[in-house]
Swiss-Prot record:
Gene3D superfamilies cross-referenced by the UniProt entry: Histidine kinase CheA-like, homodimeric domain (1.10.287.560), Histidine kinase-like ATPase, C-terminal domain (3.30.565.10), HPT domain (1.20.120.160), SH3 Domains (2.30.30.40)
Phosphohistidine modified-residue sites: H46
Disulphide bridges, residue numbers: none
Any one GO cellular component localisation term in the record: cytoplasm
Name the UniProt record assigns to this protein: Chemotaxis protein CheA
Domain annotation CheW-like: ranges: 609-745
Basic and acidic residues: compositionally biased ranges: 297-308
Domain Histidine kinase span(s) in chain numbering: 367-607
């Protein structure tokens, strides 16, 4: 594994830490004052800072350090996390995410914004904002006030009140440097755990003046040396004014992989004084060199020509660089204790918790995708085998059939297990929307509150990855277009703070995501006039409210009076609709003037496999998702009733349900089929309505592999995807909700119907 791969793992861990940071800050913003929430937020920033320091990402380290210092003030109860404080911290979390992305992608950041937030964070750490409401408090650090040092909250000590005026004289108190004796003994597997002694010593040298003695007593002969193991240990003398906590924080990510003793000069340290020590000149320029690959055969041959001790020094340099070829693993370390006794207790407790935790492993998504594809092929081959057994009319009691049934069960279990690997909660996407709301609210001068529900609803990772873009467009529209300004809301008798509600839930085997706002609703007159001006509809067109609302999905359509950085170019909602359709989903709008709008997106839980009922319609084989079917029944002539010229109803247990001829909806036939000669599938749409879909016959139930029709052909209304049956035939999977919508009068266009697909 090279350095780029290790960095990528670090950035993946940063994404997790940023999500934890965002979640914790939002909890605090909602009034949560659980100390563990504060600790989780602090650990997230501290972990990012520690990893960034190992890779020399100085900008990220500097900002995270100031952020961490301010959070430590909250941890030690020296700073009250009121709304003003949390606003600064939420914006700081956004900047921390920007710096992380810039370090990952090589892009730029808003340096002016970063500097401003550093000033605000330093001001908070210095106590310049009161703990109560502080609307009039300054947002920048006054001249003459130095940034706060990390707060030390040792047990048995109480915070002491003081005045910042004491620092205005220029005679700032200084802390006398102390000399610490440090013994650092890495365990043999230090490098394989993602740590490097040279990086740790480099970070330690930044704390003050340092001299080092290296113990090479455990160094084996060259022929038995493993360059991936650690053999050296160090005794370090450090003169610093930072204190013991700062020293221990350098080794925080290696504390489980080494023995570390820190004591003031003159105290007792853990290394045997009789052990042979060899002074090592400490040249930081050596540590700054880029790590190279392990020595080749020529290097090892050259090393073997000299004394084994001299060769060992070269081998040790190679060993220190091997980390950059080793896999780095995520670590959630316990908080550093404030003294040596609490440090030992915290470490023991953390190790016990870690041993009890559920083990996890990080796997490349490409490997998971390949596994899912193989499972899909396994499902197809299992179906083909079942078809062959049926065609050969094998005795149902034979060992072949028994083995086939076991194979079907195992295939189902494998498929369920694999799909569970890819299933992830929508929480990361929802948390990302919080930042969008904050940014748009600041740009528009609106007061907006985002409420999220169903964050733990799970869906396939492919769906989650492609969900962020359409949700971003919808959130921007909801805040910019949907919500009124505080003045207009007050005039309308509303709360000046607007509300955007984002919810996720499972329904009918799909995931349904709703985005609702309590704004003014869609101005249908304005939408209609804009559509007429753009020649989208005729001036005398008679459109329902639903049809008018759906006009906003046309490409280039916008009701904005002027173009801004947020909206007005008409490239938003059409992108949303295309993105949702590409995932096999749908989007609907419900709006009430003066009350707001609701956008409902319906998406499949997975894009890989589904359980379906194979049916025949006009000599064509189709698949209906089982999750949408309530029951099947054979219609009787007495249960069929005509309504109007073309509508038919079927009586089911003293209630009437519209009867939909699937073949006619899909333009497979012109005249309606005789319902008595077919089978009715009672289906339920996501909106809760029921329809009886009329098909010619039922072939059976199958687990089928979903193949994208849009990727290979185009989007076909009424069709969700395609699949390959056991006999090799291609069958199309019905989009039940689209069929139900078409039965309400929104007929499918002939040129885009199933017949057009060939």
């Amino acid at each position: 594994m090279d350095m780029n791969e290790i960095k990528e793992i670090f950035f993946q861990e940063c994404e997790e830490q940023l999500a934890e940071l965002e979640s914790g800050l939002l909890k605090l913003n909602d009034g949560d004052r659980d100390p563990e929430t504060v600790n989780a937020v602090f650990r997230a920033v501290h972990s990012i800072k520690g990893g960034a320091g190992a890779f020399g990402l100085d900008d990220l380290v500097s900002f995270a350090h100031v952020f961490e210092t301010t959070l430590d003030c909250v941890r030690s109860n020296r700073l009250e996390p009121n709304q003003d404080v949390l606003k600064v911290m939420l914006r700081s979390a956004d900047v921390l995410a920007d710096l992380t992305n810039a370090a990952r992608d090589g892009g730029g950041v808003d340096e002016a914004r970063s500097r401003q937030l550093i000033k605000e964070l330093e001001a908070l750490a210095n106590g310049e904002l009161p703990q109560a409401a502080a609307e009039s408090a300054p947002k920048t650090t006054p001249a003459g006030v130095a940034p706060a040092a990390p707060v030390v909250n040792e047990e048995g000590f109480q915070p002491v009140a003081f005045s910042f005026d004491d620092f205005e004289t220029g005679d700032e108190p200084t802390i006398e440097p102390s000399t610490y004796e440090i013994v650092f003994k890495p365990k043999s597997d230090l490098y394989s755990k993602g740590n490097d002694a040279t990086l740790l010593l480099r970070d330690l040298s930044r704390l003050g003046e340092m001299s080092i003695h290296c113990n090479m007593d455990t160094l084996p002969p060259l022929d038995r040396m493993n360059p991936e193991e650690a053999y050296f240990s160090w005794k370090i003398s450090l003169k610093t004014d930072k204190g013991e906590e700062a020293i221990r924080s350098v080794f925080e990510f290696a504390e489980w992989d080494c023995e570390l003793d820190v004591a003031l000069a003159g105290g007792t340290v853990g290394m045997d004084e009789d052990l042979p020590m060899q002074p090592v000149p400490f040249d930081l320029s050596i540590l700054e060199d880029e790590a190279q690959a392990p020595a080749g055969e020529e290097d090892r041959a050259a090393a073997s020509e000299g004394d084994s001790r001299n060769a060992a020094v070269a081998a040790a340099q190679t060993a220190s660089n091997v980390l950059q070829m080793a896999q780095s693993t995520a670590r959630v370390s316990p908080e550093n204790a404030r003294n040596s006794q609490s440090a030992s207790a915290a470490q023991a407790a953390a190790q016990q918790a870690a041993s009890a935790a559920t083990p996890t492993i990080r796997v490349d998504l490409d490997r998971v995708d390949r596994l899912i594809n193989l499972v899909g092929e396994l499902v197809i081959n299992q179906a083909m085998l079942s078809q062959s057994v049926i065609e050969n009319d094998t005795n149902g009691t034979s060992s072949i059939n028994m083995g086939l049934e076991e194979l079907q069960q195992l295939t189902r279990e494998i498929q369920d297990s694999v799909m569970a690997i890819r299933a992830q909660p929508v929480k990361p996407v929802f948390q990302r929307m919080s930042r969008i709301v904050r940014e748009i609210a600041d740009m528009t001068g609106k007061s907006v509150r985002l409420i999220t529900e169903g964050e733990n609803t799970e869906v396939d990772k492919t769906v989650i990855d492609k969900l962020a873009e359409p949700l971003t467009h919808m959130i921007r529209n909801a805040v910019d277009h949907g919500l009124e300004t505080p003045e207009k809301r007050v005039a309308a008798g509303k709360n000046p703070e607007g509300t955007v509600r984002l919810t996720a839930k499972h329904r009918s085997g799909r995931i349904v995501i709703e985005l609702a706002d309590d704004g003014a609703g869609i101005n249908r007159e304005k939408v209609r006039q804009k559509a007429i001006d753009n020649d989208l509809i005729a001036a005398d067109a008679n459109l329902s409210d639903e049809e008018v609302d759906n006009l906003i999905f046309h490409a280039g359509f916008s009701t904005a009076d002027k173009i801004s950085d947020i909206s007005g170019r008409g490239v938003g909602m059409d992108v949303v609709k295309r993105s949702i359709q590409a995932l096999g989903g749908r989007i609907n709008i419900s709006s009430k003037p003066g009350q707001g709008s609701i956008f409902t997106m319906s998406l499949p839980l997975t894009l890989a496999v589904l359980d379906g009922m194979v049916v025949t319609v006009a000599n064509q084989t189709l698949v209906v998702p089982l999750t949408a079917i309530v029951e099947t029944l054979q219609p009787e002539a007495s249960a069929i009733h005509s309504f109007g010229s073309s509508q038919r109803l079927i009586s089911i247990r003293d209630s009437f349900c519209p009867l939909v001829d699937v073949g006619r909806i899909l333009n497979f036939r012109g005249a309606q089929a005789n319902p008595v000669e077919g089978v009715a599938l009672l289906v339920e749409s996501e909106g809760g309505g029921q329809r009886a879909l009329m098909v010619d016959a039922i072939q059976g139930q199958r687990q089928v592999v979903i193949k994208s029709l849009e990727a290979n052909y185009t989007h076909v209304p009424g069709i969700a995807a395609a699949t390959i049956l056991g006999d090799g035939r291609v069958a199309l999977i019905l989009d039940v909700d689209a069929i139900v919508a078409a039965s309400r009068g929104q007929s499918l266009k002939p040129e885009m119907s199933l017949a057009a697909a060939g």
